[in-house]
Amino acid sequence: MKKLMNVLPLLLVAVLLFGTACQGKKKEVENVNVTLFDRRTPEIKALVNGDWELVSGKNAREFCEYENTFIKFADDQYVWTEDGKAEPGALNWRKADTGAGYEAYLMDVFYETNPAYPVSVKGDTLILQDCSETGYKYTLVRK
């Protein structure tokens, strides 16, 4: 019994140390995997808001990589930064035909004449689809 009383405080200290060490891991980013084209704007904005790096754009014929290009979304506004030069703009959210047979909330992040719409967020990756004839799909990674 006396040995148990000597070991018990050590076990208690070990459990406390282990418990506090694991608390820091609870703050990991939630793994998101959702489509956005079928959501309402408050949900879309909540998932899209923040800093993103534009990595690539592609369609059936072409693939384009981007360097030093970043987009910060903040509800109805964005800031496009390329090679250190920042250009702010308005997203002008509106529900309209995508040209792919369904409606989605379009935004003017690339070109006003060819708006884009958010397709999905998977983990730290955002996919945007433009409504142009070329039909580019853009990949952005959260910073």
Task: Indicate residue ranges for each PLM-predicted region.
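Bacterial N-terminal signal peptides that target proteins for export
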Residues: M1-P9
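C-terminal motif of bacterial Sec signal peptides marking the signal peptidase cleavage site
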Residues: F18-A21
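Bacterial signal peptide processing site
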Residues: Q23-K26
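N-terminal helix-cap/turn-to-beta initiation motif at the start of protein domains
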Residues: N33-E53
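Contiguous, well-ordered beta-strand patches that form the walls/edges
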Residues: K58-E65, D75-T125, Q129-K137
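Short, solvent-exposed mixed-charge patches
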Residues: V141-K143
